[in-house]
Each structure stands twice: as structure tokens, then as C-alpha cells.
């Protein structure tokens, strides 16, 4: 987890860190006095009054606060918090974060939900892809997720996978971006309208 905002980290009841990963551009970081540090190892080891020490963005030490260095360039006192390795989200569609509250899609089954939202998703723009990526990744980061695999399969109006990747770099969560495509619109037996960008996704895939 990149610690971009100390205050945000201090007010999050559960703080997650990716073991062995870059977490911020700084010289040293000391996390100490966490109520519990959950290692998530094979034995389920939990360390009371735990913490970690990182140098140049790489975690070097994990253990009881008493066993860690006394100071660092940045020090986080996490009393009342739980520290754990970062969570991994293995399946996401980040662009859908923009359409959660569409009335016609509430309480619908999957196919009717898709039929309702495909026309809206067909109006996605490069900017909308970027914003939805950042909204979704920031929400994941605040809930302890440090890695996400996203499946983007609609590319209308000039949208590209690159738009998502560039936007994700500003957040700091690891992103495994994957590109899908659809070749069948509604007239051919598929779910999305023919003009929703599904055919465009095939053209983009073939072009690249």
C-alpha cells in the first residue's frame, strides 16, 4: 500500500501493507504499536503491539515494536489499528463504479442488469474510464486492497486500456489490467446493443 496521506492512514481502522513491495518514495518508514499485526503466514501468526520497518520503499523488518528501530524518517503510530498484508482483488470491472445507482438496474437479475446498463456504458469516454479507475482503486485501497486485477472489455468513443493504466499510476495500487472484447451485439444474439462499443472492442483488439 502506498502511504500517500498520513492522516488517511491514521484514521483507517485497518491498515494494509504489501510485504516486500514498494510503498512510497521515502528513505525509511517505521510503523509501530499496532494493536495487532496479522502476518497471514501458514500458522496464522498475530503479533500484539506489532509493526514494521521499511527502507527505500521495501519492507525489511516485521515484528514486535520493541524489536524494531526506534525511529525513521516517517513514523506511524497505529495504536488501535490492525496491520495486515495487502488484500488482492482478483476480479473487477472498475468502469462499472460509475453506474451503481442507476434506478432501472437496482435489484435486477444479471441479464436485465446488463441490458439496462450497456447503453450507458456505450457512452463511456477516455475520461470516464480514467475517473472510474481512480474511484474504484481508491475505494479498494481504503479497504486494505493493494493489488487488483481489472477486466475492461468496452472501448467506445476512443477509450483505450492505456487510459486506465495511466490513471491507475496516480493512485499507487498495483493494477493487473486485462483487456477483453465482445464480437456479438444484440442483433446477433448478444446482450449489448450493436452500437454500445462491443464491436469497437474487437477492432481495438485487432488493431493493437
Label the model's feature ranges:
Residues 17-19:
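Aromatic (phenylalanine/tyrosine) cluster motif
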Residues 88-90, 148-150, 175-179:
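Hydrophobic faces of well-ordered beta-strands that scaffold small-molecule active sites
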Residues 22-70, 82:
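N-terminal metal-binding scaffold of metallo-dependent hydrolase/deaminase domains
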Residues 159-208:
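Metal-coordinating catalytic core of metallo-dependent amide/deamination hydrolases
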Residues 22, 100-151, 156-173, 208:
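Alpha-helical scaffold segments that flank or form the walls of functional sites
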Amino acid at each position: 500500500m502506498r502511504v500517500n496521506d498520513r492522516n488517511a492512514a491514521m484514521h483507517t481502522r485497518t491498515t494494509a501493507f504489501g510485504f516486500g513491495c514498494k510503498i512510497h518514495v521515502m528513505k525509511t518508514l517505521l510503523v509501530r504499536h499496532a494493536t495487532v499485526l496479522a502476518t497471514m503466514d501458514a500458522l496464522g501468526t498475530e503479533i500484539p503491539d506489532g509493526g514494521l520497518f521499511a527502507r527505500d520503499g521495501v519492507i525489511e523488518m516485521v515484528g514486535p515494536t520493541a524489536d524494531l528501530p526506534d525511529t525513521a524518517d516517517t513514523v506511524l503510530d497505529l495504536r488501535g489499528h490492525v496491520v495486515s498484508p495487502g488484500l488482492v482483488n482478483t476480479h473487477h470491472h472498475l468502469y462499472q463504479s460509475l453506474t451503481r445507482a442507476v434506478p432501472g438496474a437496482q435489484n435486477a437479475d444479471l441479464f436485465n442488469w446488463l441490458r439496462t446498463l450497456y447503453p450507458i456504458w456505450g457512452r463511456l469516454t477516455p475520461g470516464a474510464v480514467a475517473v472510474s479507475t481512480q474511484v474504484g482503486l481508491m475505494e479498494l485501497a481504503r479497504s486494505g486492497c493493494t493489488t487488483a486485477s481489472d477486466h475492461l472489455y468496452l472501448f467506445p468513443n476512443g477509450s483505450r486500456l492505456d487510459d486506465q493504466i495511466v490513471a491507475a499510476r496516480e493512485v499507487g495500487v498495483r493494477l493487473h489490467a486485462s483487456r477483453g472484447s465482445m464480437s456479438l451485439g444484440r442483433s446477433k444474439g448478444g446482450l449489448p446493443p450493436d452500437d454500445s462499443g462491443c464491436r469497437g472492442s474487437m477492432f481495438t483488439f485487432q488493431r493493437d
